[in-house]
Amino acid sequence: MKTFEELFTELSEKARTRPAGSRTVAQLDAGVHAIGKKVVEEAAEVWMAAEYQSDEETAEEISQLLYHVQVLMLARGLRLEDVYRHL
């Protein structure tokens, strides 16, 4: 199990080191438009899971949405502090 901050640190490191075969690197290379489409897709899956699936499945979908949001943040050069400032 990892925290939101730990995930962001891990993804930031992957963005920096660009390991071969990394899903994160592939998404970053695809660009903001492709990542944004994935965020929208995952948000819809969260909604559907919340409506029709178990808490476990909903939590899994939320974790995937958070992952893609963080990848989008990295693609835009945003830090956690940039977002926290608006919470």
From Swiss-Prot:
Keywords: Amino-acid biosynthesis, ATP-binding, Cytoplasm, Histidine biosynthesis, Hydrolase, Nucleotide-binding. GO terms for molecular function: ATP binding; phosphoribosyl-ATP diphosphatase activity. Pathway: Amino-acid biosynthesis; L-histidine biosynthesis; L-histidine from 5-phospho-alpha-D-ribose 1-diphosphate: step 2/9. Its main location: cytoplasm. Its EC number is 3.6.1.31. It is found in: Cytoplasm. The keyword ATP-binding applies. It catalyses: 1-(5-phospho-beta-D-ribosyl)-ATP + H2O = 1-(5-phospho-beta-D-ribosyl)-5'-AMP + diphosphate + H(+). Gene3D superfamilies: MazG-like. GO terms for cellular component: cytoplasm. CDD domains: NTP-PPase_HisE (cd11547). One of its GO terms (biological process) is L-histidine biosynthetic process. InterPro entries: HisE, PRib-ATP_PPHydrolase-like. Belongs to the PRA-PH family. This is Phosphoribosyl-ATP pyrophosphatase. The lineage of its organism: Bacteria, Bacillati, Actinomycetota, Actinomycetes, Streptosporangiales. The gene is hisE.
